[in-house]
């Protein structure tokens, strides 16, 4: 089989990343892809999420209470979670809606109702807190610097009231603020009352999130159809007499998912649904293979049952290959046009001066 240069590029850029073992291996949850013009506004209003089908919703029926082995009772606690993403943005969007018969949020520390989320963007697995490591013993400082580096844990206060919206259980609290995260919450109840809460937020998963800050960090690359490791738990406090006793409702059906990325579950980053797409869409990208030779590889990313491709490179030459490699004779900035077509119609994409060679 002849492997062209462009085929090699496509292979290297689309090959699946290796993933560790997951909890509930027979179950795969889905992350809805929002169209780029319908990104949710983080304002505590779930209206933007109406386009997400109910099949994406994760309810209380998918969670197990692992601390006390309590039975599900929607009159005590009931939840709904939807996950979203936008192609081209390395963000995870979350809508959390909950009913609780007793909302606890008047204590300054962690003794209150919490939505706890753990994400492992590159499926590296393994402990993310030193207490769960068995391979070596870390001293206090090394343990602190290890915490949350390759997978992140967010303790999200529901509601936060006068606290920061979440506590990052790690050495990198900077990941909870802009431009890495944002959140909004709406509710009308008071502490100790029953009622409904709506929480909207987005976070940025990191393959490497160090104590020093974002300068050395590595953001996880979110790609269509990729699997990420993720799980969440609802910590449900019910007030006196024991503020320290709470229910731990886990999507992984384990308790230590809070600190072990190998106990997360699979979430697939879904493609854009056809209802948001045209039958035929032209799109493409390129890579400069050799600037000295002005050698450029063009890569088709069009959508639809296309059977023809016409590339106009802006220098008077044309190609009908799907993924051509072109050499420019002269330096300059070029207007490149791709026209695709088939039985469903045609479309074209023009990029002005993106392709520049010297």
Model-derived features with residue positions:
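Extracellular/lumenal mature domains of secreted and surface-exposed proteins
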Residues: 274-358
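Long, low-complexity, intrinsically disordered N-terminal extensions of eukaryotic proteins, enriched
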Residues: 6, 18-19, 345
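Sec-dependent N-terminal signal peptides
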Residues: 3-13
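C-terminal segment of classical bacterial N-terminal signal peptides
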Residues: 12-20
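Structural preference for beta-rich elements and adjacent junctions enriched in aromatics
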Residues: 21-286
